[in-house]
């Protein structure tokens, strides 16, 4: 009985501490009528990351460009086992810098720093352009 209580306490502690490191802004991406892209700006510090969520359909292509080379972009969503690196030279992208979405549903784009810069608690400003075709 005591072991179950300890396991629950450890799990709760892990959940609470993991979310505290992920402070940042959450944005629901809105594409204006007749437009397939949206632009946002932000600032990340240390291990924080900003999250941009959007809905897309299987087979659509997403292209992300970011103004700060020191910021990384990763995509999470249906049909993606872990995450997909959407940075400029990622092998996941086609020759046009686009990633073909594997399933329909809600996707989450995270903008974060490299581990080295996060450890140094650096702050980075960025502009991001998200396109869905």
Swiss-Prot record:
This is Inhibitor of g-type lysozyme. One of its GO terms (molecular function) is lysozyme inhibitor activity. It is found in: Periplasm. GO terms for cellular component: outer membrane-bounded periplasmic space. Residues 1-22 form the signal peptide. GO terms for biological process: defense response. Disulfide bonds: none annotated. Keywords: Periplasm, Signal. It comes from Escherichia coli (strain K12). InterPro entries: Peptidase_C_arc/bac. Gene3D superfamilies: 2.60.120.380. Inhibits activity of g-type lysozyme, which confers increased lysozyme tolerance to the bacterium.
């Amino acid at each position: 009985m005591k072991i179950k209580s300890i396991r629950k306490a450890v799990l709760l502690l892990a959940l609470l501490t993991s979310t505290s490191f992920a402070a940042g802004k959450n944005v629901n991406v809105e594409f204006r009528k007749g437009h397939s892209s949206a632009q946002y700006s932000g600032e990340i510090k240390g291990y924080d990351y900003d999250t941009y969520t959007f809905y897309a359909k299987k087979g659509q292509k997403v292209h992300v460009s970011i103004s700060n080379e020191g910021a990384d972009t990763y995509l999470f969503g249906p049909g993606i086992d872990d995450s997909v690196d959407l940075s400029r030279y990622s092998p996941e992208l086609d020759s046009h810098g686009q990633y073909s979405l594997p399933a329909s549903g809600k996707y989450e784009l995270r903008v974060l720093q490299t581990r080295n810069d996060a450890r140094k608690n650096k702050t980075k400003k960025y502009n991001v352009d998200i396109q869905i075709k």
